[in-house]
């Protein structure tokens, strides 16, 4: 496991596992957890290129190059992230061409971070649909970040997988964990 943490708030870890003789890597990015992250969220929303995003792309390019060199071009390598980390992994995927799986991601709006979004799958928490107005569905609960971004015409890159998490659903990664692992022991 490789851990990346910086003074600017960037946090990511590389995980490796061997599954039936096949080596797999996941580079996981942390979401917003302090005010410096919120500043980067706002900067990115308005088209800036925060240092965390630049660092995410630079590290992803270095790691993908090293892994390709060691394991070949078909290395099993993917990115995963939530919120701010979701935006960072989307940018990393567009820079490297490797798959990204996001959960309630921040949009990527900076032109110098955009690329081919075909390898990005975004998982968005939905609450309970209340009504539709002006062609937009209005939900109670669900991901407030995605609701804000879509209502201000800011699109997230890649495919979107809406997951009905129910009335109490929020922006947290815990909601997805509880959905996917309904029968887990606490």
Regions found by a protein language model. Name each.
Residues 80-85, 89:
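Gly/Ala-rich beta-loop-alpha elbow adjacent to hydrolase catalytic centers
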Residues 1-79, 95-96, 106-115:
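A conserved cap/lid and substrate-binding interface adjacent to the catalytic center
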Residues 17-24, 94-186:
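Serine hydrolase/lipase
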